Design a protein with these regions (language model features):
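N-terminal beta1-alpha1 ligand-phosphate binding loop
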Residues: 2-39
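Short beta-strand elements in bilobed, periplasmic/extracellular small-molecule ligand-binding domains
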Residues: 39-53, 140-148
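A general structural signal for well-ordered alpha-helical segments in protein cores
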Residues: 24, 28, 66, 94, ...
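Glycine-rich phosphate/pyrophosphate-binding loop and the adjoining helix
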Residues: 2-7, 61, 139-208
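Helix-loop-strand module that forms the ligand-binding subsite of alpha/beta enzymes
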Residues: 61-139
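N-terminal beta-loop-helix "entrance" segment that forms/cooperates
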Residues: 46-64, 155-156
Length: 208
């Protein structure tokens, strides 16, 4: 890993939980603090609740919040998604947002990391996000499950468990480094990550 980040790397953070107090929001806070210390520019997209249900018939309409979402994704160098797992799948709000990117090309060859904090660590949510991101041409370069987050947090919901904070920091370092990683290396990295989740690594967008 590199020791620092070139100032100006744009990190887009997306929290899939709409709760006022969320372990996934707390995970993003840890990542954002480290990214800020390394000179990255952080853009936190907090409008998932405003995005309407995806309708292909409206894909080309001028919907302000959707256009804002697409613009901010396109402008990002790297993306961090933290999402809870609901009923064995990814949170509907975050999946809906990424559905609005279908066919846009905004995720093509973009490095992404996924965190899921929840009772069991959100394996199914992480697998679902790996599929969605890979099918959209993104490179999933890191993923992390945080189980039993309440036991790893203080009374205000901030992560205090050293191992958890270190794991989130390591994921963030890897994601930021991915902004300057050669394309062929990103392909190999993403193939290993999605393959470890049981997703077909052959679906990873090739370097050529």
């Amino acid at each position: 890993m590199q020791n620092d980040v070139r100032p100006g790397i744009r990190l887009l953070t997306v929290c899939g939980s709409l709760q006022a107090r969320s372990a996934n929001r707390a995970a993003i806070a840890v990542a954002s603090s480290l990214a800020d210390a390394r000179g990255a520019t952080i853009d936190d997209f907090d409008r998932l609740a405003d995005i309407p249900a995806f309708n292909p018939d409206r894909a080309f309409e001028h919907i302000a919040v959707v256009e804002d979402w697409r613009r901010r994704v396109a402008a990002a160098d790297v993306v961090l998604v933290a999402t809870p797992e609901y009923a064995g799948g990814v949170a509907g709000a975050v999946k809906n947002a990424f559905d609005w990117l279908v066919g846009s090309g905004h995720m093509y060859r973009k490095p992404v990391a996924v965190i899921s904090a929840g009772t069991t660590g959100g394996l199914h949510a992480r697998v679902a996000m790996a599929q969605t991101l890979t099918w959209q041409g993104a490179y999933l370069v890191a993923e992390l499950g945080v189980a039993a987050p309440r036991t790893k947090s203080d009374d205000d919901g901030r992560f205090t468990d050293g191992a958890t904070v270190t794991a989130i920091a390591s994921l963030t370092e890897l994601l930021l480094d991915a902004a300057a990683t050669p394309l062929a290396d990103l392909v190999d990295l993403a193939g290993g990550v999605v393959g470890s989740l049981g997703v077909d690594a052959g679906r990873v967008t090739p370097a050529v």
